[in-house]
Design a protein with these regions (language model features):
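Single, function-defining residue in the core of a domain
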Residues: 1-9, 26, 30-31, 35-38, ...
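Short, charged amphipathic recognition helices of the HTH superfamily
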Residues: 7-21
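Short hydrophobic/aromatic segments of transmembrane alpha-helices and their interfaces
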Residues: 14, 56, 266-267
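Short Lys/Arg-enriched helix C-cap and helix-to-coil transition segments
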Residues: 41-54
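Long amphipathic N-terminal alpha/beta scaffold segment
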Residues: 55-60, 75
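Conserved beta-strand elements of the Class I
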Residues: 64-66
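A glycine- and small-aliphatic-rich helix-loop capping segment at beta-alpha/alpha-beta transitions
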Residues: 81-85
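Conserved mixed alpha/beta core segments that line enzyme active sites in large multi-domain catalysts
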Residues: 86-91
C-alpha cells in the first residue's frame, strides 16, 4: 500500500510517514530495489480487479456514461534510464524533458477510471488506445455503455469498434463547414438539424463493389479500419445520427452518435456531450490533488507503477465519497458534497493500514468536510499552454 498512499513529498519523507518514523524503516534505495522487481502490469491488474469488485457496489442502471480522453505527464530522466521514445527535445523546454501519455476511460456517474493505456510520447496513438479500451471493457448485464469523446476521437474505426461491441458512441466532430467527416456528408450547411444516415465504407476501387447508401467513402491503406481489410470487395455500413445545435456564442457544435432519436432528444445529446468535462476535472484532481505531477523516479517503468498506483488511490477515494451519506440542515441555499481534496488526504492516511493501531473512522470525518455545490458558476477555459516542467527531486515540500 506504500505506492498507493504515497504523496508528493520526497521518497524519504514518505517512508518516514508510512512507517511512523521507525528507525528500522527501509531506505529509499531499498524501496527502489524492491520496485525494480515489480512490473507495472501487476499494478494494472490490481487496478482492474479492484474495479470489478467496485462495480458490484453500484446499483443497476440502463446506461453507463464513459468519457474518453488523454493527458500527458512529464518527468525527469537521463538517456541511460529512458529510451528516446520518451524524450521531447524542443517546444516547451530548451533543455528537453521526458514525457508519456495517459489514455483513460472515465465513468461520469461513479467518477472512477474504468481503464487506461499508457504510451511513450512518441508512440502516442489515442485512436488505438481507445479501441483497446473499448474491446477489453467489461460490460454489465442490462446496462448499455455510451462512449463520449471530443473530436480528436471521431473516426470510422472508433465508431465501428463501439458498434461491434453493440454499444453506443457520442463523438464531437468538426463542423459541416469544415473539412472532416461531417463536412463530406450530405448534410445542410447551416442551422440546427438532427438527421440519420448510413455511411458505407469500402476499401477497394473495384467496379465489382455494388455499394449503396446515403454516403459511400473509400478508406485507403494509410488509414486504419480493423473490420474490413484493404483491398476487400466487401463493404461495411455505419449507421450514424448527426446532430447540430447552437451554442450561446452563436456558433454551432456537431455531434455524431448512434443513440436512438426516440429516447435521446437534441437537448439530451447536448447535455451528454457537455458532461464529458468531468474527465477534464478528474485529470486536474489526479495530477494536483492525488499527486501525479510529482513523480519519485527517473525510470519510465517506475513512472508507470506510480500512475497505476495513483489511479487506484483516485478510484478508492471517489468510491468512499460516493458511499458517504451527506447530512445537512433543511432549507440550505446550496446542496453539499464531500470536499475531494480533504477526502484524498484522509484516505491516503487510511490506506497506511499496517502503521495505524487505531485507524481513523473515515465516514464521520468526511461528513464534516463538505463544500457547497454551485452549479451556476462557470469559468472560461485558459487559452495558454498548460505545460509545467517536472519538479526536481530536491525541490519538494518537507
Amino acid at each position: 500500500s506504500f505506492l498507493v498512499s504515497q504523496g508528493a513529498s520526497s521518497t524519504g519523507n514518505e517512508l518516514d510517514d508510512f512507517f511512523d518514523f521507525h528507525c528500522d524503516a527501509p531506505s529509499p534505495s531499498a524501496i527502489n530495489q524492491q520496485r525494480d522487481k515489480l512490473k507495472p502490469q501487476v499494478l494494472e491488474e490490481v487496478c482492474h480487479q479492484l474495479l470489478l469488485s467496485l462495480l458490484k457496489l453500484d446499483p443497476p442502471s440502463p446506461y453507463r456514461f464513459l468519457a474518453a480522453d488523454g493527458s500527458s505527464f512529464s518527468f525527469f530522466s537521463t538517456p541511460k534510464l529512458a529510451p528516446d521514445e520518451y524524450f521531447v527535445s524542443g517546444g516547451h523546454s530548451a533543455k528537453g524533458f521526458y514525457s508519456l501519455h495517459l489514455n483513460a476511460l472515465y465513468d461520469l456517474n461513479s467518477h472512477t477510471y474504468m481503464d487506461a493505456v499508457i504510451q511513450p510520447v512518441h508512440f502516442k496513438d489515442e485512436f488505438k488506445a481507445f479501441c483497446t479500451m473499448v474491446d477489453r471493457l467489461e460490460t454489465l448485464e442490462g446496462t448499455s455503455d455510451i462512449f463520449i469523446a471530443d473530436r480528436g476521437y471521431c473516426s470510422y474505426n472508433n465508431m465501428a469498434h463501439v458498434l461491434e461491441k453493440k454499444q453506443f458512441f457520442l463523438f464531437r466532430s468538426k463542423d459541416v463547414n469544415v473539412r472532416g467527416i461531417a463536412g463530406h456528408l450530405p448534410l445542410p450547411k447551416q442551422g440546427s438539424f438532427d438527421l440519420c444516415l448510413d455511411i458505407v465504407i469500402k476499401r477497394s476501387h473495384s467496379r465489382k463493389i455494388a455499394a449503396s447508401g446515403d454516403y459511400v467513402t473509400f478508406v485507403g491503406a494509410a488509414s486504419t479500419f480493423d473490420f474490413l481489410p484493404y483491398g476487400s470487395l466487401d463493404t461495411y455500413t455505419l449507421p450514424v445520427r448527426v446532430v447540430r445545435f447552437p451554442l450561446d456564442d452563436g456558433s454551432y457544435e456537431c455531434i455524431m452518435t448512434n443513440l436512438p432519436a426516440d429516447e435521446f432528444t437534441m437537448e439530451d445529446i447536448k447535455r451528454l456531450y457537455f458532461s464529458r468535462w468531468g474527465i477534464e476535472t478528474s485529470f486536474r484532481r489526479l495530477k494536483y490533488t492525488i499527486g501525479l505531477s510529482s513523480f519519485h523516479s527517473y525510470k519510465p517503468e517506475f513512472i508507470k507503477q506510480e500512475i497505476w498506483a495513483k489511479l487506484i488511490a483516485y478510484n478508492l477515494t471517489e468510491t468512499v465519497i460516493n458511499h458517504t451519506v451527506v447530512e445537512t440542515r433543511k432549507n440550505t441555499k446550496h446542496s453539499y458534497k464531500v470536499n475531494f481534496t480533504e477526502a484524498a488526504h484522509i484516505c491516503r492516511v487510511f490506506f497506511r493500514l499496517h502503521s495505524r493501531k487505531n485507524p481513523a473512522d473515515v465516514m464521520p470525518l468526511l461528513r464534516r468536510k463538505l463544500i457547497p455545490v454551485r452549479k451556476e458558476r462557470s469559468f472560461p477555459r485558459l487559452q495558454t499552454a498548460h505545460f509545467r516542467r517536472p519538479r526536481y527531486f530536491l525541490y519538494r515540500a518537507a
